[in-house]
Amino acid sequence: MPKSRFHYKTLAGSGFHSNFCTMPNRSADILFQLIKSLEKAEKRHFKLYIKRSSAKEDLKIVQLFDAVDRMAEYDEKTLLKKLPGTEKRQLYNLKAHLYKQILASLRLLKSADSIDLQLNEQFDYAHILYKKGLFMQSLKILDKAKETARINQKFNFLTQVIALEKRIESLHITRSLLDRAEKLALEANEVSTHIDMVARLSNLALQLYSWYIKHGHARNEEDEKSVISFMSENLPANAMEQTGFYERLYLYQSFTWYAFIRQDFLLYYRYTQKWVDLFRSQPLMIRVETGHYIKGMHNLLNAHFDLRNFQKFASTLKEFEAFSKTPRVLENDNFRIQTFIYIASARINQHCMMGTFREGLPLVPDIEKKLAEYVLFVDRHRILVVNYKIAILYFGSGDYGTCIDYLQKIINDHTDLRDDLQCYARLVHLLAHYELGNTEIIESLVRSVYRFMAKMQNLTVIEEQVLKFLRHSFDVSPKKIKPELEKLLGEIKHLEKNRFETRAFAYLDIISWLESKVTERTMSDIIQQKYLRSKRRIK
């Protein structure tokens, strides 16, 4: 695979203090983001924590907390006015102190909910006891922490535990040294081997996912060959023989992205199913790695969508919706937002593959409301995807004006993500204008879309044929337009089995759109009829 596709730029590290000095707006100020992310109970806990643990002079940060909390947008000038006697330099120090105190409060509040926090707390206690010279007490806590770490497969944590055990044993003989030394050496080697394999597989999964986020599906044989080559060169020789949870998780994720990039949707389905089944076989890990479980369910739904497994899609979505209402999700901001985004996306997909576009429109207001509520915490990529799906919902329902509004949000977004989505947003934008009969701008739009897609190396024969048709369609008499559409449909159907030519179908059902023009029926009606004829429809 070309090195440029998998090159990671190292971001210059910036100090904690400098982050506060360069945060002029709502989306950038990290203290503002943190305070706005807090639930009522978390704010209440912080106030109690700070009053118990701080000196009177430190209570000024409570004033700062309240001032920031009341802001709709971060404004430093307004903030300084609300804190009379505070200089700009003092404000930076106060903000840094407040930020740390909020995190300390959250750590206390959330420790029971996080295995990682619990393990680190135990390690801190063991280290304190070691420094006090209470070696046996320290080792006792380390033993308990090791047991918890092994149960929850937290092998990275074991490295620092074993390192402290070795330090205690080497500097302060506490047990049968020879037997203990041999055991610790074996443990250290075992953990090191395990961590190395997990690191290699997680790197592979992350790099493949990064490629997809940047480019989307493989555009041509060159892309496919480079992905296959990269996978072959970086997949550890004995990866398929691994039995550990994390080894299997990252192995399945690697093959998931590998298959998805190549549009091998059957392989994609097999590995997303393995990903989810891994959690089902070890239910404890759903709590430990909730984020990965949620992502697995999302990808399994996508696989059912790509294969039009209507029944399995419906049952998986129902299971995912039930999980989204569990305390584990509802009590965690990140999981609640993740499940909302993925379930919203899945519900739109369900309407798109069944042709019930109009029935899906009532979903949009709530999605918009939640996106506005979560705007500080939803990544740009996810917003692009949701906006595109909403645009397709309006396109399929025949509301081309609103479809264009949503596509403009993508076209005007300059985030360096998903070249493929940018290309197909422009193509659907062009089709929407065609449907509206905006003849005066079609030719210039065709040229613009053609240039953009060619530049991004996203132009296939199908897109070329569609663009060619659109460019000349308004010069064709109404009597001759139907034969021209039938000709175009035949040319595209001929290419239906070529994965690189039909990647457009992952973004818009071009064939159903053309069939609707030829038969003079709605696109919704065409897709609904296909659904009703499917053996895999919901019964």
Feature locations, PLM:
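"A position-specific structural signal for the A-helix of alpha-solenoid helical repeats
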Residues: 117-120, 124, 157-160, 164, ...
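Alpha-solenoid helical-repeat scaffolds
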Residues: 197-315
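Active-site/pore-lining binding-face segments in mid-to-C-terminal subdomains
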Residues: 412-481
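Alpha-solenoid helical repeat architecture
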Residues: 153-160, 195-202, 242-249, 284-295, ...
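Flexible inter-repeat linkers and adjacent short helices
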Residues: 3-5, 9-230, 240-242, 477-539
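Amphipathic alpha-helical segments of tetratricopeptide repeats
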Residues: 143-150, 185-193, 229-240, 273-285, ...
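Helix-turn-helix repeat elements of alpha-solenoid scaffolds
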Residues: 96-100, 133-143, 174-186, 218-234, ...
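Residue-level signature for tetratricopeptide repeat
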Residues: 128-129, 168, 257-261, 303, ...
